[in-house]
Amino acid sequence: MFGFQAAGAAPIVLGHVVEKPKTIATAIRIGNPASWAHAIKAVQESNGKIDLVTDEEIVEAYRMVAALEGIFCEPASAASVAGVIKMQKAGLFKDGETAVCTLTGHGLKDVDIAIAVSQKPATIQANMEDVVRVLGY
């Protein structure tokens, strides 16, 4: 089992309480987790790992999940995807292995982040030619 904490709020990875946790992933902006010991136990029993991901990696995964899967998750859920991407790039998965990420938080829990990291909508004329052009067909 693998777990991922935001770099600005990674007390388990760092091994100490983070007094002022900071991350865009508000649901995991925790400097002293109540289940710290349980998390360590789960990692040890599963021969897993807890690592950190940056806010930039979280945003990249957040956008990717929306664009490729049509899933509007919150940044804390995207942190798991960011972590798996990071691990895959580091060569920690063998070809053919499957990784599963649990994305339990809906994007509506953190709409301000969605607005902040989204591209500004295109303004076009109300005609088919412009619609086709903007959609890239």
Task: Specify the residue positions occupied by each region the protein language model found.
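Substrate-binding/catalytic subdomain of NAD(P)-dependent oxidoreductase enzymes
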Residues: 59-63, 68-86, 97-99
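Short, active-site-adjacent cap segments at secondary-structure transitions
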Residues: 8-11, 80, 109
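Extended hydrophobic secondary-structure segments that form protein cores and membrane-embedded regions
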Residues: 1-5, 100-103
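Active-site/ligand-binding loops adjacent to catalytic centers
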Residues: 2-73, 117-137
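Phosphate-binding loop/pocket of nucleotide- and phosphate-handling active sites
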Residues: 82-137
